[in-house]
């Protein structure tokens, strides 16, 4: 969509305001091409518990709340599709603030540098120490319980994970 970046912020503000009543917030907004049409994809998550599963009914309500409002911002004759979806159960944790909200959650972590011979793992985010600015993780290697203290700047990639 032409000039999408110029209206993305407005869409984000409007959608977040409308979704407050459903206790949802925007995770990400994308402009995609689908079958030669522009698609605005709005990924949402629960406002209080970022990794809470969302059911189809709440996504339908979210779509109903915002679809006409977005038309007021997008002043074009160009056709577009609107998709409101869950941000997903294994979404990326993009900031230190998001990781603080992920306490007691199961995550997959890749580190920039090895710590105690560990470069990647799946485990629980057990605590955040504000004084040292470190996160504690609990995980298992070959059945042995391990803990690791990691600073945010040593995390290369982190996302929620599903524990099997």
UniProtKB/Swiss-Prot annotation:
Disulfide bonds: none annotated. One of its GO terms (biological process) is translation. InterPro entries: Ribosome_maturation_RimP, RimP_C, RimP_C_sf, RimP_N, RimP_N_sf. One of its GO terms (cellular component) is cytosol. It is found in: Cytoplasm. Keywords: Cytoplasm, Ribosome biogenesis. It comes from the Bacteria. Pfam families: RimP_N. Belongs to the RimP family. Required for maturation of 30S ribosomal subunits. This is Ribosome maturation factor RimP. It comes from Mycoplasma capricolum subsp. capricolum (strain California kid / ATCC 27343 / NCTC 10154).
């Amino acid at each position: 969509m032409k000039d999408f970046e110029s209206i993305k912020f407005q869409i984000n503000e409007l959608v977040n305001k409308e979704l407050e009543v459903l206790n949802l917030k925007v995770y990400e907004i994308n402009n995609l091409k689908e079958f030669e049409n522009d698609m605005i994809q709005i990924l949402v998550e629960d406002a209080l518990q970022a990794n809470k599963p969302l059911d189809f009914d709440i996504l339908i309500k979210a779509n109903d709340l915002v679809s006409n409002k977005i038309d007021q911002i997008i002043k074009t004759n160009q056709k577009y599709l609107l998709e409101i979806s869950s941000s997903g159960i294994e979404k990326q944790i993009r900031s230190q603030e998001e990781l603080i909200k992920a306490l007691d959650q199961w995550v997959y972590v890749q580190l920039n540098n090895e710590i105690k011979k560990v470069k990647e793992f799946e485990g629980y985010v057990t605590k955040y120490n504000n004084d040292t600015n470190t996160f504690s993780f609990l995980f298992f290697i070959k059945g042995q319980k391990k803990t690791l203290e990691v600073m945010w700047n040593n995390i290369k990639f982190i996302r929620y994970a599903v524990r099997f």
